[in-house]
Amino acid sequence: MKFTLNWLQKYVDTTGLTPTEIADKLTMLGLEVDSVAPIFEELAALKTGLVISCEKHPDADKLSLCQVQVGDDTHQIVCGAPNVREGLAVTVALPGAVLPGNFKIKKSKVRGIASAGMLCSERELGIGEDHDGIMELPEGMAHGQRFIDAMELSDTFIEVDLTPNRPDCASVIGTAREIAGKIGRPLQIPVKDRQIEAESRDFSVEVESSELCPRYTAKLIKNVTVGKSPWWLRKLLVSVGMRPINNIVDITNFVMLEYGQPLHAFDFKKVAGNKIVVRLPRENETEITTLDGTKREISAEMLLICDADKPIAVAGVMGGANSEIDAESTDILLESACFNPVSVRKTARNLKLPSEASYRFERGVDPGGVVNALDRAAELIAEIAGGALCSEGIDNYDGKKAVEVQRFSISRTSSLIGVEFSGEELTAMLTSIEMVVEKDPENEDILLVTAPTFRIDIEREADLVEEIARIYGYDNVPTATPLVALSYPEQDDDRLKRYPLALKLTRIGFNEAINYSFVTAQHADMLQLSEQDYRRKVVTLLNPLSEEQAVMRACLLPSLLENVKRNISFQKTAVKLFEIGKIFLAQGEDVQPIERQCITGVLSGNKFGESSSLYFKSANVDIFDAKGTVEFILSEMGLTDLANNEKIEFTVPPEGAREPFSTQDYALTIHLGPNVLGTIGKVEEEVLKSFGIKHEVYYFDLNFDALCALSPQTKAFSSLPVYPAVKRDIALVVPASISAGELLATVRSSRDKLMEYAEIFDVFEGGKIQKGYKSVAVSITYRSQTKTLTEKNVEKSHSKIVSLLTDRFGGSFRDA
């Protein structure tokens, strides 16, 4: 809804309020203000002038050489307008002024004659479409004034974004009513409480469906003169972005904006049979040419306004070209009606013809205000276009609805808003927005409220409470701290571990995946699970969205493998994903499934990521990357050393205990004593094929709930080492069946007092290494807490560890 501050001022006195304050009050009333801005500021540099002489240009028949007085100065201006003449008050753009469209005025020569400015037409000023001549200002207007001051164009534009439940505010009067109620000032309405006194005999109206057209009113105005609208009317329309057309059409548009009631004017001489019929199309009526000159197809459900022979308008949307007002029209049939909102909405959408009228009809117009708008427009037409005004007309109101009275509790309203109101205060606020309020003779706490017909959103007591809150002011409601007993949620220790761990995994190159808990039942077959595997017993959904989401997942790995396939299809050369989520293990009918939280990860492609240097392009992930990630997880969770000196171990599972989707050569079980905490491995090629993956994929799968339940060993802190460390590397060639982890565990179990740390840094097969054997390289750090080690001290401890490895594993050593 668009209006200006000066227009609003015609209906409610806003003296003392700035545009910003008015916008704030509208916002607090629940009307969202989109914009507040001054208008016609681009015309501020223009002046009023007086043509004191006008002569023909010596070198051009169609140009005039004018002397124009602007204040104390006289300017010579060459003008080509046919209506320029001596004594004419004009709008002058002097050099330096900028017209709409960024047209800069400069001193120039026109056919050899100097011209110091421009006399402007309405189109050049952006306030109309007339370009046949310059704009003629009122006779006797003082020259030298600012044009926007002289023509009262200086104004503020306000645009309000209305919600669908407030069609009453799709008018300037409706908005003024809200402001008046808020600031406690009277509302001035030009025409109200009108009724059609007598039925006209000059024409007839027939409405075939009162459901589609609850009310239809019309008046005939004779002997009008169609012409240009007066300046005040054109100015108001232009200020809100509407194009003036002629006095009749401009009046209907003005009243629509003023009252929120769309109107339409027919040329009565073009209405066959002097009859209006509101009906649906006949079988042979398939198209109509609307006012914009476009032929439009009409369908069977579109409501039409017809004369005795043919359709002459699409109800609530647009008039027909066969009955439009033109310069020759003298008798006007003025329509003011109420159409079904749903019907108008469908018609406007189907015709792709939104309009200001359909905008209001779609939201619902006031059936009680139809005659007020009709009379207001009729009076303006008689005043401006010289028509003969008569009181007769036709009012077909077959769709009138019974008035509903709402019971309104004073005490409940006070309780809900938090302010103690009296019945008199509530009555004053409601009557300020034109509601009728009476006391209930049987109950002092109850007011009987009748909402006006334009408030279609008032349906129950809660709506009235909202009206009181709006008018009183939400910002005036006192704030009070609610007395609520606070309860703190139980601390989720697992969650406190989950988030930091996920964050740290992303920092070492992983991406977190969050997949649906609903998966396909085919996953068990794709993983090659045995018939006895507990993960085949799934929780089935009663109403799945699709077959792809028919069961609850019993394992996180399948969804991650689908993620791998998708990433590879997008040319990702390095994929590292993990997910921390729940799996659901069925326990039989009528028994809740076990929910277990797991952390599962997959690794495929380049070891160092897509941005790795050329040197590392061929380095792909292997089982040690998966194992290293698990060790990182255990370390970050503080589970490297457990209470009671327990240790989490990695072992090669026996053949029957290996995961069916893991290869035989690359499989590890993670356990704490007899309890299995998870597995690591390389996914079988056949399993990968079932997921459409052609690249190697390594995985880890851990019971996160079980890990969170473990108690880490209390850390014992010692002072920082003072003496330097000595590193020695050894490489042992052993049978390929011996795991590197077993060899490392042997080194660490030596318990040599000088050995501080040991780690494997290389495992190598092939080359000069005998087939069936591999080289395992171990780095050992030696340090003393009391002295600097000598070569002799280190050699003694190192030899001891070498002997230990030789005795246990055999093989040969090579000093690294």
UniProtKB/Swiss-Prot annotation:
Keywords: Aminoacyl-tRNA synthetase, ATP-binding, Cytoplasm, Ligase, Magnesium, Metal-binding, Nucleotide-binding, Protein biosynthesis, RNA-binding, tRNA-binding. InterPro entries: aa-tRNA-synth_II/BPL/LPL (IPR045864), B3/B4_tRNA-bd (IPR005146), DNA-bd_dom_put_sf (IPR009061), Fdx_antiC-bd (IPR005121), Fdx_antiC-bd_sf (IPR036690), NA-bd_OB-fold (IPR012340), Phe-tRNA-ligase_IIc_bsu (IPR045060), Phe-tRNA-ligase_IIc_bsu_bact (IPR004532). One of its GO terms (biological process) is phenylalanyl-tRNA aminoacylation. It catalyses: tRNA(Phe) + L-phenylalanine + ATP = L-phenylalanyl-tRNA(Phe) + AMP + diphosphate + H(+). One of its GO terms (cellular component) is phenylalanine-tRNA ligase complex. The keyword DNA-binding does not apply. Residues 401-479 form the B5 domain. Disulfide bonds: none annotated. Its cofactor is Mg(2+). It is an enzyme of class 6 (ligase). Transmembrane segments: none annotated. It is found in: Cytoplasm. It comes from the Bacteria. Residues 40-148 form the tRNA-binding domain. Residues 721-814 form the FDX-ACB domain. One of its GO terms (molecular function) is tRNA binding. Binds 2 magnesium ions per tetramer. Its EC number is 6.1.1.20. Mg(2+) binds at residues 457, 463, 466-467. PANTHER family: PHENYLALANINE--TRNA LIGASE BETA SUBUNIT, PHENYLALANYL-TRNA SYNTHETASE BETA CHAIN AND LEUCINE-RICH REPEAT-CONTAINING PROTEIN 47. Belongs to the phenylalanyl-tRNA synthetase beta subunit family. Type 1 subfamily. HAMAP family: Phe_tRNA_synth_beta1. Tetramer of two alpha and two beta subunits. This is Phenylalanine--tRNA ligase beta subunit. It comes from Desulfotalea psychrophila (strain LSv54 / DSM 12343).
